[in-house]
Amino acid sequence: GPWESSLTPYMIDPINTLSAREYDAVVFVGPARTGKTEGLIDGWIVYGIICDPADMLVVQMTETKAREHSRTRLSRTFRHSPEVSKRLSPSRNDNNVHDKMFLDGSFLKIGWPSITVFSSSDYRRVALTDYDRFPENVDGEGDAFTLASKRTTTFMSSGMTLVESSPGRDITDTKWRCGGAH
């Protein structure tokens, strides 16, 4: 059904920060099944399609999970939202499980952590979901966050990288400290 922010009021700040130009990334770590993917990932996709069209890359933990997310959550959302479905390109060649084109020319890529997904394309928005399940080094090229963030640099202050995760890994940098609320 429709998003109801009163059920997850703790998601409002991170969601709003996604459009704040003074930040180039949002990293949200929280328990499983608390609205992170629906609010941050799916909500950001829909917001972008309807309110602020731009190319976007969504990276799931594996190719199988990318396909599943596209075929279940995104396909259902697109089908049941008149505002989204009327913007989707009607051409069969424009839409498949990993690529979605829209009438305004914007593009949504649903991928997985591989150097080919993280190379040679620019996206204003990049979202990494279930980051704790990503490999620590993607195809010998570095961590997924650094690779993903490079995709948004062309867009300067309007580029944004989102990482959503559960606390599934030990902290490796014990000197890191949060510098502020965001």
Task: Give residue spans per PLM region.
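Phosphate/NTP-binding elements of NTP-utilizing enzymes
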Residues: G1-H182
